[in-house]
Amino acid sequence: MLKEYLTEEKYEELKESNDMIYKALELSLELFKSDTDKGGFPYVLHLFYVYKNVLEKEEKVVALLHDVMEDKNVTKEDLLEIGFPSKIVSDVLVLTRRKDVSYDAYIDNIIKTGSKEALEVKLADLKNNIDLTR
C-alpha cells in the first residue's frame, strides 16, 4: 500500500500534482530511499540511469516507476489513485515480473503488448542490469 511509504501531506501533494515526471521522481525517491543495489550503490541510481536512457516523457515516467510494483508493496490501484494515467500504470504493470512467470514468458509478454514505451524502458533497464559493478 502506497500510503505506508508516504506522509499524508506528501501523499496529497503528489496526488494533486499534474507533473507526471515530478510525481514519479518524488515517489521513487521515497520508496527506494534506503535501498541499495548488489554493488552497494543507492538503488535510485538505477532508476535514474533508466530514466536518462529513454527519450519520451511517458517513457521517463515509466522508467522511474518500473520497479515499484515488483519491489515494493504498491498496486496498480495505488498508482491510479495517486493520479498516474492508465497507460503509464499499464506499462508499469507489464514491466512487473511475477514470481510464477518464467523470464522468457515475461519478456515475450512485454513484446506481445506492443507497447513501445514498455519495450524502450525494458531495454534501458537491461542495459544497466548488465553492468557488473552494480
Short names for language-model regions:
Residues 1-134:
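Active-site helical microenvironments for divalent-metal-assisted chemistry
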